[in-house]
Amino acid sequence: MGQNKSRLSSFKKRRLPSKANDEKHNKFDDLVKTNEHILKSYISTYNHELEGGADLNEESLQKYSDKFNSEPKNRLALNAICNDDMNKVLLNRDAAIKDIHVFSEKIQLEGKATNQKSSGRCWLFAATNVLRLPVMKNWKTSNYLSLSCSFMTSLKKRINMIALVEEDVESRLIQFLFGAPVSDGGQWDMVINLLEKYGVVPKCVYPESYNSSNSGRLNWIVTTKLREFAYQLREMHASEKSIEVLRHAKAQMMEEIYRIIAISLGEPPKVFDWTFRDKDGKYYEFFGLTPKQFYGEIVNYKATETFSLVNDPRHPYFNLYTVEYLGNIQGGIPIRYVNIPIETMKQLTIQALRSGKPVWFGADVGKASDSSLGILDNRLIDYELGFNIKFCMTKAQRLEYAQSLMTHAMVFTGVHLEDDRPIRWRVENSWGDERGEKGYFVMADGWFDDWVYQIVLEKKDAPNELVEVLKQKPQILPAWDPMGSLAI
C-alpha cells in the first residue's frame, strides 16, 4: 500500500533507556535487568505457544545463556546490533554493490518519480504512472495526472453496510470488515472501475490537498463514522425497520461521508479547461473537457483491455480467483485474478518491457529491502550471518501463516538479462526522488520469485489461453485472504 503503512504486526518495539550521557550511566544495571526480563518474556511466550503453557525453568535458560556466551561471534553480534539499526549492521555490501542501475532492456519513455507521501495510494500512483506515458508520448508533455479525483471517488464508493446486517457482529467476516471499512488502498480492477465511471484529470486542475497526501486522519474520521453508521443500521434492522427506512437512513449517512471527504480533498471538477505547451513549444488548449473525455480522448488508454495475473502457489494455476466483498463500485467489474506460475509471470513481464510497455505490479515491499538505497534483494540483509538462522518457509507457507501478503504497488520499466535470463529489474516507485536512483529501485530476480504476487498486462500481450481463463466462474477467496490485502 505504501511507504508508511505496514500490513503485518509483530512484537511492539520497546524503547529502553540508553547510556547517552554520564547522568544515565548509573542506570545501566537497571537496563540490563530490563533487557533480561524482556528476553525471558519473549522466550516464555514462545515456549507457551509451543508447549501448551509449560514455562521454561531457570536451568534451561542458563543452558541457553552458557551456549550463547561460548560463541565469540554472538558477543560481537550483540555489541554491534544492540547499538544500531540491525539492517544497517547486517547490510551485505557485496550485494549492494552488485545491484546496479544498469539494464539491458528498458522502456524508452519514463516519467519523473512521484510521491504518494503519507498515504496508501500506491495502487493509484502506480496506475497513473502507467497512464501518463501515452500522454507524454502523444502530446509531448510531462503533465502529471490527478490522483485525488480517483482517491475521493474510491473512498465514496467502497461502502455497503446494509447487505450484512443479519451477519453475527462477532463473526470473523464482520470483525474483519469493521477492522478497515474504508481505506485509501485498492486493486487494479478498482482502477478500471474508477476510470470507466469517472475518468481522470490533469493534476493542474485538481491538485493534491494536504489530506490526500496525509490520509491517516481522514481515514480515521471516515472509519469512525462508518462503524457508527453500521451499528445504527444494525440496530434499526433489529428493531424491524423496513429496508426502505434503512436505505433512506443510509443515504443521509452517505451525505455526511461526502461532506467529510469534500471538505478534506475538495470536490473534483465536472468540467475543466486544459492548456499547455509541449516540449517543442507548441501551444494547445482544450475547453469544456469532462474527466471521462480526458481519459478517453487525451489519455486514450484502454484499461478495460487489461487484466490481472497473480502468483499464488497455495492454489492451482490457470484458474480464476476473486476475493469476497472486495470491490469499489456497484455494477463495476469484480476483482479477478488469473493464477500463473512465477516463471510464466516473469516471461510475460519481460515480453511487455521489450515491447516498450510498463508493467503495474503488486508485491510485499517491506521484505529484504532498503528503501533509502532503493534495493530489493533477498541477499541484502544478512540475518544468517548476524543471528545464525535461516528462513525456510516457502512462498505458499508464508501466505498461509500470515508472514507475507501484498503491501505495495509499483511499476516495472526495465530488466537486465544475461543469456536471456533475468538478473535484476528496474522499478518505478512512488516514494519521491530522493531514494534509489532518482526514485527508481533495483530488484534482484530472486526477490521477484519470493515477494512479487501480481502483474497487469494488456490482453493482447498475453497468451490466449490465459485470457480465456477470464471466462471461468471465479473461485472465491475469503475477504481476509492475503490476495486482497493491497486494498485494505
For each feature predicted by the language model, list its residue ranges.
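Intrinsic-disorder signal
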Residues: 7-29, 33-36, 40
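N-terminal regions that are enriched for targeting/export leaders
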Residues: 28-111
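Helix N-terminus capping/helix-initiation residues
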Residues: 57, 85-86, 145, 290, ...
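Long, positively charged binding patches that form subdomain-scale interaction surfaces
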Residues: 332-407
